[in-house]
Design a protein with these regions (language model features):
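Conserved NTP-donor binding/palm subdomain of two-metal-ion nucleotidyltransferases/polymerases, i.e.
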Residues: 1-205
Length: 205
């Protein structure tokens, strides 16, 4: 992947990211990725009574990274753990999203996540905006139309191609609520992937 490589450490899969965000796909990701570098400000935290020391990024870094990462999965794999990550951060630090985050569609998505924290997790974070997409985000988490790891539930060449095409268009439509990304580029990226790995064209797993 142009974004990250994978390796295993003691049997645990690890993603070694080249960038914090997917700057190769989303136009908004590039300036947000640069902002994350300025927000990093790691500080040392002692664990287990001081036996271990780890460095953690600033709350502002985590606020932007966690919410943007969740947005990248909108329509294609957003899960309850994305909401819980945001809820834990809100509970610890409150609303600490950097003031430099001004994109209205991204802010609407973050507000929608926050509304769900209030409704589902009994939190009380003041938030305004994002109401029109709250139910969409909820359905994506709890009842995804195209589960990312659910495989292809149809058989036959035509049925598989039709299912995958509908899934691609659906994912694009969902992510277009937040990001500017060309449909034709998404289609071209899919074509290139399948040309490189022809066996994946009709793969159902």
């Amino acid at each position: 992947s142009p974004k990250h490589s994978n390796f295993y450490y003691k049997g645990i899969p690890v993603e070694n990211h080249k960038t914090f965000l997917d700057v190769f796909r989303y136009k908004l990701a590039a300036p947000m990725n640069e902002l994350l570098h300025t927000l990093l400000n790691p500080r040392e935290v002692k664990l287990c009574g001081g036996i271990y020391q780890v460095h953690i990024p600033s709350p502002e870094f985590n606020a932007l990274f966690l919410t943007f990462h969740a947005a990248q999965h909108f329509g294609n794999g957003i899960r309850l753990h994305h909401l819980l990550d945001w809820a834990f951060l809100l509970k610890k630090y409150g609303w600490c999203l950097p003031k430099e985050v001004t994109d209205e569609r991204l802010l609407d998505f973050i507000c929608a996540l926050t509304h769900l924290c209030n409704r589902l997790l009994d939190m009380d974070i003041p938030v305004k905006g994002g109401e029109p997409i709250v139910s969409i985000v909820y359905e994506q988490m709890m009842h995804p139309l195209y589960p990312p790891h659910g495989g292809v539930p149809v058989k036959g060449v035509f049925a598989i191609l039709r299912y995958k095409t509908k899934r691609l268009l659906y994912i694009h439509r969902m992510q277009a609520m937040i990001f500017d990304h060309s449909l034709w580029r998404r289609i071209w990226e899919s074509i290139v992937v399948h040309i490189r790995k022809p066996k994946t064209i009709l793969m159902r797993g």
